[in-house]
From Swiss-Prot:
This is Glycerol-3-phosphate dehydrogenase [NAD(P)+]. It comes from Mesorhizobium japonicum (strain LMG 29417 / CECT 9101 / MAFF 303099) (Mesorhizobium loti (strain MAFF 303099)). NADPH binds at residues 29, 49, 122, 154, 269, 288, 290. Belongs to the NAD-dependent glycerol-3-phosphate dehydrogenase family. The active site is at 205 (proton acceptor).
Length: 343
């Protein structure tokens, strides 16, 4: 086995007992978070549907999703959902946003009552427009819901590089407890009781990451990139306010922080998708980009709620094939002039 060794031991949290943490999802982010939980001193099980992924993790690697990173022993991987959830103290849901409902439906009968379920995916459900926390509350009403979000690439977390995220729950005490239990030497977890704000920031930044990638791919320049990200954040705040998100949450790690990271690196699937789009290359075969379904949903929400969100609308129209990038730029640049802060 080759690759960069990743230790399963780091630092446990003083005064916090070890938990049995179950991770639902064997992709790059699920595997990275499993390693992070291991470093925080917890016993970790990982559920993946793909038997090959389960076998690979058992052999200390996940070449399909985290190539080049050797995973130290300690993560118990399984494709048996009942075994994965048995005796769990906490569950991290790391399946794609559009698959969450189906995953929870499968997990429902084996989910221990009362344990927290932490959302680690970012998005809005395509068919219903529901935030992911609403799906959890519908399917698992006896399990408190939380969300982990912030500027974090899977490879960085898997390698144990310094990273800061936020853990949010409506119950402030639960959020603080989860943040303390998840934190380790190079993973700093802040807490928040603004669950909706954290979810909105994480979902919408994916749309602007596609736009950022398209701007770069089309060669529109650094000035256009900066303008798009800045005005995109204005739209994020507008939609966040309509959902009741607090402004300070959107200015934090899960909003502005994640937006800056995702809009500046091809490590982001959404940026990479937009980059390919801007270059005029074929999109077939690219990894899942959550911003694609989210763009259409966010554009619809903006229209329904009377929110001015021209960048989101442009991204949705480009992805739908209704307009070209050039046409979108012209439309955005010729909008009626206004005061910058007139929201």
């Amino acid at each position: 086995m080759t690759g960069e060794a990743v230790s399963g031991q780091d630092v446990s949290n003083p005064g916090k007992s070890s938990w049995r943490v179950t991770v639902l999802g064997g992709g790059a982010w699920g595997t990275a978070l499993a390693l992070a939980m291991l470093r925080a001193g917890h016993k970790v099980r990982l559920f993946a549907r793909d038997p090959q992924t389960v076998a690979a993790i058992g052999q200390g690697q996940n070449p399909r999703y985290l190539p080049g990173i050797a995973i130290a022993p300690g993560i118990e991987a399984t494709s048996d959902i009942a075994a994965a959830l048995s005796g769990a103290d906490c569950v991290l849901a790391v399946t794609p946003a559009q698959s969450l409902r189906a995953t929870l439906a499968v997990a429902k009968d084996n989910m221990p009552d009362g344990i927290p379920l932490v959302l680690c995916a970012k998005g809005i459900e395509r068919d219903t427009g529901a935030l992911l926390s609403a799906i959890v509350e519908e399917i698992l009403p006896r399990n408190p819901v939380a969300a982990l979000s912030g500027p974090s690439f899977a490879t960085d977390v898997a390698r144990g590089l310094p990273t800061a995220v936020v853990v949010a729950a409506r119950d402030e005490a639960l959020a603080a407890d989860l943040a303390a239990r998840f934190s380790a030497q190079n993973l700093r977890c802040y807490s928040s009781d603004d669950l909706i704000g954290v979810e909105i920031g994480g979902a919408l930044k994916n749309v602007f990451a596609i736009a950022a990638g398209a701007v770069t791919g089309a060669g529109l320049g650094a000035s256009a990139q900066a303008a798009m990200v800045t005005r995109g954040f204005v739209e994020l705040r507008r939609i966040g306010a309509a959902f009741g998100a607090r402004p300070e949450t959107l200015m934090g790690l899960s909003g502005l922080g994640d937006l800056l990271l995702t809009c500046s690196s091809a490590q982001s699937r959404n940026f990479a998708y937009g980059l390919t789009l801007g270059q005029g290359k074929a999109l077939a075969g690219l990894p899942l980009a959550e911003g694609v379904p989210t763009a259409a949903i966010a554009a619809r929400i903006a229209v329904e709620r009377g929110i001015d969100a021209p960048i989101i609308a442009a991204v949705a129209a480009i992805l739908d094939g209704a307009i070209t990038i050039s046409q979108a730029v012209t439309a955005l640049m010729t909008r009626p002039l206004k005061t910058e802060t007139n929201d």
